C-alpha cells in the first residue's frame, strides 16, 4: 500500500552545525531529485533554521534511508517515521509542539509556504495534499482554542529575551538587526516593545529595511554599511537567508578596533546557515550566541505552557482520528472509482457491439441507441451499488485486508506489484505474486460473445 514516510533532522537531536552540514543543496534540486525517483509518487521538503524534513509517498517505507546516505547526514541525528508517525509529527509540528519555542506562530507560516512551493513545483498529490491541508487546519485550531502561542513564541522573540538575560535588560541599548525577512521582522517587533535607545535595520534590499524601520521608528542601514554600524551597536541579532557569512571575523575585528575598549558587543546568530563566522567568538569583548543558546529560553517557555500543550495534544489526537478516517474513505473511493471506470469501459464496449449487431439487421435511430445506453448504464449502476456500500463500510471499519482483496480480485491497484518489485530489487524474497490481470475484463467480455 502506498503511504507517507518521512525523515526529520531537527534541533532535538542535531546541533546547528550538524543541520547545516546535513543539506547544502537548493530546494528545487532536492524536490526534483526526490520526485524523479522511480518509487516516489509525491514529496514535500520543509527547511527552516531549526529543521530539515522530507515527506514522501511511496510503496516502500525505507526509501528515505538511501536519501539520508546521499545527503551524508549521520543517522544518529535523523528520525525516520512511517505513515502514522509522520502524520502525528506533522500535526504536532503545525501546532507548534515540535518547535524549539513551543507554540511559536512562525512554523505554521513556514509549513504553508514550503507546502505551497512543493505544490507549485508539481511534486504533491492527493495523499500529501490531504495531510498538509489537515496540518494547517489543526495548527490554526490549536492557536485559536488554546493560549499556546501567548508570550515569547518565536525564535526572534527568544533571541531578544536571550539578549535581555545576558545584558540584564536592554534599556538604553543600541541594537542592530540584520535581515528584514520573516525572522528579522519578528526580532524587530519584539525589540520595539523594549525600552531600547535605538533600533537599526540592515537588509540586502534597502527598501525593505526602510519600510520596517519606518514602521517601528528605527533607522535603515545598507548592508554594505554594517561594519560602520558595528562601532556603535551594543547588540547585533542576525537572521538572514544568505548562503554565506554576513559578519566575518575580519569585519568584526575592524569594528572592534574602533570601539571603546571597555565596551562589550553581543552578537546573536539565529540564521541557518549561520550569518556570523564562528571564530568571531575568539575576539576580545565579543560574546557570540547562536540557536543552540536559545534552548535555555525554550525550556523556560515550555514550563509556562505545559497546560496549553496538553490541550493541544488532545486536539491533535482528535484530528488524527478524523484524518485517518479521511484516508480510509479515500482508499475506498479510489477502489470504487477504478471499479466504476472498469465496469463502464466494459459497458461502452458491449453497448457498441450491441449497436453494431442491430445495425447489421436494420437501421436503428437515436431512440434505440438511447434505450441501449440507459439500459447498460442502469445495469452497471445496479451491479455496483451493493459493492460500493460494502467497500465504504469496510474502509470506515479499517478493514484493509478486505479492500486489498477487492482490489486484487478486480485488478485495480498497481502499487502491490510495485512494492513487490522494490522488495525483489532489494533481494527480499517475494512469496505472493499478483495474478496476471492484463485484459481480464476483455476475457470476460470475449467469453460472453
Swiss-Prot record:
Keywords: NADP, Oxidoreductase, Porphyrin biosynthesis. This is Glutamyl-tRNA reductase. One of its GO terms (molecular function) is NADP binding. It comes from Methanosarcina barkeri (strain Fusaro / DSM 804). Its EC number is 1.2.1.70. Belongs to the glutamyl-tRNA reductase family. Substrate binds at residues 48-51, 99, 104-106, 110. The lineage of its organism: Archaea, Methanobacteriati, Methanobacteriota, Stenosarchaea group, Methanomicrobia. Possesses an unusual extended V-shaped dimeric structure with each monomer consisting of three distinct domains arranged along a curved 'spinal' alpha-helix. The N-terminal catalytic domain specifically recognizes the glutamate moiety of the substrate. The second domain is the NADPH-binding domain, and the third C-terminal domain is responsible for dimerization. It catalyses: (S)-4-amino-5-oxopentanoate + tRNA(Glu) + NADP(+) = L-glutamyl-tRNA(Glu) + NADPH + H(+).
